[in-house]
């Protein structure tokens, strides 16, 4: 394994921890800042929207910058945002810190995923991307559960202090392992914009928004769902997040392996399974055993889609991939925001903490429809692409 892939995974661990840990701390943040659970849930949406804004702007700004320097600069921004969150006395300041930290997210994963794909043979690109994203899955297995436990025992601000330190450790990993001569982005700003004129790229981006939105409509409210519906204690949430994170690890590895072989078909099958699991979760959430099992399956299937979703955009973008890859990270987080918002709406409407699962199933079904259309279009165009390659 190239050492640079390890550095990317370490950084992904830090970013993933700060993105997801807030979900396990919604009750603590809500009580401390005197806001409702749905309002606290907007801290998830705010982070996601920060990614959406920051991804294209910072990816374009990094066009002519050495990739190592770009990644280090983005990680410094991440540290600053988490430091602001750690000292935040109010909801508004906390939201500001979340947004600052989020600005680097899309560009980091966009540049990082393209670099990861460039470091290995063509037939291993999806697996290399999956390896980078394994940092996100490990964040859910280790960072999020223990960050949640830390926040429950010492206050939620202590979690953000810990994440700030984690960001500094990630920065050290980048400086140590990513070579100073890391390939410069070869695209001009103009060439990076070309893929965004293609219908298939936008179809892939929309699939990401809806598919991942389905996952986060449910997962955003996992803490109150597990305590108020399934009957778990607040302390059990930490171990439920470990269980979910274990599912993410398994799903990420499985998704990368199958996406290497047949990305389009794999994506369709996984989105079909995601729709089914979310639908079932609405009913299994009523009991502890069913809720725990379904939460694990949600992690497996939800994150198994990630390598295929990112690889599909890179393939459709052709030669100029950095901006398209970054925009797809923004699409993941736009899906997060939409999912969290819709989940909050159904809770506010009085349908209960299990109802967001059905909202998520509807979003995942939309992603399934778009993935099916995209797979059909790619199958029709494959002979043309092969002929062009042979010409």
What do these predicted ranges mean?
Residues 93, 121-177, 225:
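Helix-loop-helix hairpin linking two adjacent transmembrane segments in secondary transporters
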Residues 265-309:
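C-terminal transmembrane helical hairpin of 12-TM major facilitator-type secondary transporters
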Residues 55-66, 251-263, 347-348:
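Helix-to-loop junctions at the C-terminal end of transmembrane segments
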Residues 53-92:
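Conserved MFS/SLC helix-loop-helix module at the cytosolic interface between two early adjacent transmembrane helices
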Residues 34, 66, 87-93, 231, ...:
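Helix-breaking motifs and short loop linkers at transmembrane-helix boundaries and internal kinks
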Residues 316-353, 360:
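A late C-terminal transmembrane helix in Major Facilitator Superfamily
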Residues 6, 77-84, 92-101, 289-297:
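Paired small-residue
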């Amino acid at each position: 394994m190239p050492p640079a892939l390890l550095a990317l995974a370490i950084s992904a661990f830090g970013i993933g921890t700060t993105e997801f840990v807030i979900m396990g701390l919604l009750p603590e943040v809500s009580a401390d800042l005197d806001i409702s659970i749905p309002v606290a849930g907007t801290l998830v949406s705010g982070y996601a929207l920060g990614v959406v804004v920051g991804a294209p702007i910072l990816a374009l700004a990094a066009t002519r910058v050495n990739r190592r320097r770009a990644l280090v600069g983005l990680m410094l921004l991440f540290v600053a945002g988490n430091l602001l969150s750690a000292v935040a006395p109010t909801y508004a300041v906390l939201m500001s810190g979340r947004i600052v930290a989020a600005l680097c997210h899309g560009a980091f994963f966009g540049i990082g995923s393209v670099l990861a794909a460039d470091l290995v043979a063509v037939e291993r690109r999806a697996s290399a991307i999956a390896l980078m994203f394994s940092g996100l899955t490990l964040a859910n297995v280790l960072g999020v559960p223990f960050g949640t436990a830390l926040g429950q025992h010492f206050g939620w601000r202590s979690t953000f202090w810990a994440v700030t330190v984690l960001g500094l450790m990630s920065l050290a990993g980048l400086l140590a392992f990513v070579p100073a001569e890391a390939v410069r982005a070869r695209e001009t700003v103009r060439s990076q914009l070309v893929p965004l004129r293609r219908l298939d790229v936008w179809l892939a981006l929309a699939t990401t928004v809806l598919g991942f939105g389905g996952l986060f409509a449910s997962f955003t409210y996992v803490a109150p769902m597990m305590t108020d519906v399934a009957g778990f204690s607040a302390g059990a949430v930490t171990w439920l997040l470990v269980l979910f994170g274990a599912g993410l690890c398994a799903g990420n590895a499985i998704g990368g392996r199958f996406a290497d072989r047949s990305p389009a078909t794999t994506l369709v099958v996984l989105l079909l399974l995601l729709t089914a699991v979310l639908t079932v979760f609405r009913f299994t959430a009523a009991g502890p055993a069913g809720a725990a099992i379904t939460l694990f399956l949600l992690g497996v299937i939800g994150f198994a889609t990630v390598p295929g979703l990112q690889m599909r955009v890179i393939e459709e973008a052709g030669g100029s991939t950095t901006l398209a890859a970054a925009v797809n990270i923004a699409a993941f987080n736009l899906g997060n925001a939409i999912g969290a918002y819709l989940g909050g709406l159904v809770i506010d409407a009085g349908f209960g903490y299990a109802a967001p699962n059905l909202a998520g199933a509807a979003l995942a079904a939309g992603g399934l429809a778009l993935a099916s259309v995209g797979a059909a279009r790619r199958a029709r165009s494959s002979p043309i692409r092969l002929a062009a390659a042979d010409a």
